[in-house]
């Protein structure tokens, strides 16, 4: 929040029309340009360093309005004169500016909500490594898990209409619609069963943001009913009027959802149901029988079909036994296994040997998908054999090349340091280290053996010290407010940079 002090000082009484003037502010595009919204750990955006002109951006916006189009198709791009001058760069800059502006809007709403709660600073962003104590505590008591692929909106216009409920600025929304349809660069009809990578690679963060707003619409209904039902179960009889009022509201929802809502009210009374969503995937886990999981499954299908006009593909929603199924979550393969132990107990003159089997959580690094990601970026081949990458060494010094490989190795160890087995991490380090040496040898037209002798043991020590530095990270202790926020059922993770590692196929 400290990064946006000048934006958060805006007049909050003009929430409906303060967005449009920000489009012409140079610091908006500087912020999106300097922070590198599209950076990736495995791919470095070399085109992001291109210079841009705010004057050209203003002219493009003016000419967009002069076109007087509501939708710009892919065939119209050749006829529009304002798109002939470096079209991709400036459309990308405008969309990135929109991404910063709408995030500022949500930051303002977050600050106002925190001020009402008398919380000075938000501590509810947690690292990925805080998930493992949660999984160790909760997952051994669960029995069934279901992976669901969140469907995409049928039409791109639905994303824009969803944003209309949050942004009350017609001018900004009109320009936003024109830019988004043009940057989409093909038909706005989305017919795909692939992952969320279908969004344009030029500015995926903005489309992720729109997609999350769209999913939030039905999640808000889901969480409202779940929290209210769970709250009313634990209240005393003197709040019976509130209970009756809430059930009356449920009856009104039947007209909205077009299904028999009271029949599925029992679903929200399950205290052991866990709901997790990340990227385009959601996970349901429960302690009870598969029958309850099937009810949850058909409830989500009916909710999406009747109210949001999307299809969840129920034939691809599988209910798996957690003890026999590995959970693919945020780049980890998590499963629990029985850890047998023998305890000897003695009472007076008699001794007993007790076999005790405890459930233990295993978090495994998926080595095959990671090798595939490294192969796509030319660090190794498909079987994991390190190769040189001459394109990265063309205009870089030796120190820059080594620093780039060390940074990638550090990020890998940081992200996967919660793994229970480190053998796969050492294999990844071997691939990166040898690929770095081969890249340097190819640059200097030398052999790997000669270059290893030239670098000496200091080169290996840099990789070892980087690993030790990462694995010995000491995270700051959280305050009392942070601990109280940690007890909530909704989780927020501060994973903002390492996107490629947690992508699911």
From Swiss-Prot:
Disulfide bridges in this chain: none
Keywords annotated in UniProt: Chloroplast, mRNA processing, Plastid, RNA-binding, tRNA processing
Pfam family, one: Intron_maturas2
Domain of life per record: Eukaryota
InterPro entries, per the entry: Domain_X, Maturase_MatK, Maturase_MatK_N
Any Gene Ontology biological process: RNA splicing
Principal place of residence: plastid
Function statement: Usually encoded in the trnK tRNA gene intron. Probably assists in splicing its own and other chloroplast group II introns.
Record protein name field: Maturase K
Gene name per UniProt: matK
């Amino acid at each position: 929040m400290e990064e946006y002090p000048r934006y958060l000082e805006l007049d909050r009484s003009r929430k409906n029309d303060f967005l449009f003037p920000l489009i012409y502010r140079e610091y908006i595009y500087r912020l999106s340009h300097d922070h590198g919204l599209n950076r990736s750990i495995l791919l470095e955006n070399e085109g992001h360093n291109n210079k841009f002109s705010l004057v050209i951006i203003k002219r493009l916006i003016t000419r967009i309005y002069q076109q007087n189009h509501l939708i710009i198709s892919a065939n119209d791009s050749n006829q529009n004169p304002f798109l002939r001058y470096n079209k991709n760069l400036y459309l990308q800059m405008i969309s990135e500016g929109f991404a910063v502006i709408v995030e500022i809007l949500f930051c303002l709403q977050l600050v106002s909500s925190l001020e009402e709660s008398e919380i000075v600073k938000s501590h509810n962003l947690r690292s990925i490594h805080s998930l493992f104590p949660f999984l160790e505590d909760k997952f051994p008591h669960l029995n069934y898990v279901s992976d669901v692929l969140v469907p995409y909106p049928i039409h791109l216009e639905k994303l824009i209409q969803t944003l209309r409920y949050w942004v009350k600025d017609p001018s900004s929304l009109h320009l936003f619609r024109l830019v988004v349809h043009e940057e989409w660069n093909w038909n706005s009809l989305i017919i795909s069963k692939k992952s969320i990578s279908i969004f344009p690679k030029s500015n995926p963060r903005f489309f992720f943001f729109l997609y999350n707003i769209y999913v939030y619409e039905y999640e808000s209904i889901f969480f409202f009913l779940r929290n209210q039902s769970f709250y009313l179960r634990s209240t005393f009889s003197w709040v019976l009027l509130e209970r009756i009022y809430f059930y009356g509201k449920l009856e009104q929802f039947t007209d909205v959802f077009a299904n028999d809502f009271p029949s599925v009210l029992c679903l929200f009374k399950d205290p052991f149901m866990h709901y997790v969503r990340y990227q385009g995937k959601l996970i349901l886990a429960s302690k009870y029988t598969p029958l309850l999981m099937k009810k949850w499954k058909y409830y989500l299908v009916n909710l999406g079909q009747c109210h949001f006009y999307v299809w969840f593909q129920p034939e691809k929603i599988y209910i798996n036994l957690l003890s026999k199924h590995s959970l693919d979550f945020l780049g980890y393969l998590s499963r629990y296994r029985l850890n047998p132990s023998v305890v000897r107990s003695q009472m007076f003159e008699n001794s007993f040997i007790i076999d005790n089997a405890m459930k233990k959580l295993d978090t495994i690094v998926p080595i095959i998908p990671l090798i595939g990601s490294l192969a796509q970026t030319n660090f190794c081949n498909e079987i994991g054999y390190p190769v040189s990458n001459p394109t990265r060494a063309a205009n870089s010094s030796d120190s820059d090349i080594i620093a780039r490989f060390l940074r990638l190795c550090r990020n890998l160890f940081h992200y996967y340091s919660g793994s229970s087995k480190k053998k796969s991490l050492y294999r990844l380090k071997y691939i990166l280290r040898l690929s770095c040496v081969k890249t340097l040898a190819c640059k200097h037209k030398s052999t790997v053996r000669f270059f290893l002798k030239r670098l000496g043991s200091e080169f290996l020590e840099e990789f070892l010290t980087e690993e030790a530095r990462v694995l010995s990270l000491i995270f700051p202790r959280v305050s009392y407010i942070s601990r109280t926020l940690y007890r909530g059922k909704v989780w927020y993770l501060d994973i903002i940079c390492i996107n490629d590692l947690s992508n699911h196929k």
